Amino acid sequence: MDVKAEAPNGPAPVKNENQNQPKPQRENMNMNKNQNQNQNNNMGGGGGPNKRNNMNMNKNFQNRGGKGGPGMGPRGPMKNEDFIVNSKLKNLAGPTHDLPELVCEEIKFSGRNRLYIGNLTSDVTEEELKELFSPYGEISEAFINAEKNFAFLKIDYRANAERAKKDLDGRMRKNKPIRIRFAPNATTIRVKNLTPFVSNELLFKSFEVFGQVERAVIIVDDRGKTTGEGIVEFARKSGAMSALKYCSEKCYFLTSSLRPCVVETFDHIDETDGFPEKSLMRKSNDYYKARQNGPRFAEMGSFEHEFGTKWKQMYDMYKQKHDALKREMQLEEEKLEAQMEYAKFEHETESLREQLRKREQDRDRQKKEWEDRERQADESRIRDEQQMRRQQDDMQMRMQRQDEEMRRRQQENSLFMQAQQLSNMLDQQEMNHQGGGGGGGNGGNGNNQGGGGNQGGGRRNYNNDRNNDRNQNFDMMNQGGGNHGGNQYQGNQHYQGNQDQGNRFDGPPQRGNVRPWNNNDRGHRDDFQNKRRRY
């Protein structure tokens, strides 16, 4: 890309390398380039760096954060003046006991080295001024107002500026004398209402948050005692304006004392050169009228003495009022200081009371929480004990039921064994009866004596020791007569427990266990089960 030489009053024109491209594409590329080339004075950290200044930069973006660059970086945060001041104040928070000592070195091109050049002509140029002042040092920030015929410039050091002022002031240029004096420094402020414990270092650090500070001093009297005032010189006018704004709108404290500093613009007083004779307008009538009489003393009782005395009385009255106002101001300051200390003590006391109340509330809360935990632990222990007791009772009940079930099963088994033995005995008895009564059945005629064979059997008693010594009597006598022969109706009553078993001989046949003697079928017995119950 071809770049021409820079013009004196503006940047050089830049040749556009996209001129040979189609118009829509060229417009899009220019738009993207303008978006990526925006630079901001108070920009945040954005994406890729911007190496060139965009001539068509929109002024509305000066206080905005930087956008993301070609690398698609995130947009930087909005950093305005409040954010910068608060960030610097955070670094100063805390004790300021051991501040480093300031190095008193003269700053090059400071605001104190700025000269005012007046009574110029409209054809003056910057090259001419630089050529005129270059023998006295380096020149910077030359500004010319051709309409009002004055200019400003900075010389590197104060001594060089004073030498240039002394040599060039009153020099003739195009039949007009040049007027040179030190320009009023708009970057300097006066700080008042300072405590006796504010030093040059603390003043420098305190006002450095508003901008770069070149010089900060505390004004002292002839005994070296601080007067409660100081002077701060900034490198830029924006720093001084920022300090004036913040200290006027807010209360800015430099120490622990609740005594805010008061910031005012600094009125420059020239105590070096003063007002020379060449600065007077000698052609005016007032000048000639005032210079008709020279220095003299007035005679007592004269007209001059009378009015001279009145002027002195008025000045004395001013001085008295000024001193009275100063004393009153001092008394009010002491009174306010005492009130401030008392209010500060009360505030600290109330803060301690509030902390004590909070501690008591925390103690009560912790005590309540501890009591709640203890109560919950007791309730949990009681519930566990009750649950354990219920479990033990349930276990004992289950054990008792198991024992009862076991005893019941043992009784059932014993009864079943007894019933089985009784059944076996009855079966054996039936078999014996069937074997011994066969002949009696055949020999019976009509005389009801056919059962004689059965009488031979007689009456038998079976004693069972295993069934609790039960006596079982079985009568084998045939009461049927001739028609029945050897068949008998035998009514047997089976006893379980401690009952007796017997035969009924009269009445109709019983249905307890009626079975023919010659019937050996044992499949239809209904007294006990044949198979043993399993447990």
From Swiss-Prot:
Chain intervals with Gly residues compositional bias: 65-74, 434-459
Gene Ontology CC terms, in alphabetical order: cytoplasm; cytoskeleton; nucleus
Residue stretches making up the RRM domain: 113-185, 187-268
Pfam families according to UniProt: NOPS, RRM_1
GO biological process, one term: mRNA export from nucleus
Sorted UniProt keywords: Cytoplasm, Cytoskeleton, Nucleus, Repeat, RNA-binding
Functional summary from the UniProt entry: Component of nuclear connecting fibers associated with the transport of ribonucleoprotein particles from either the chromosome to the nuclear pore complex or their transient retention in the nucleoplasm.
Protein name in UniProt: Hrp65 protein
UniProt source species: Chironomus tentans
Gene encoding the protein: HRP65
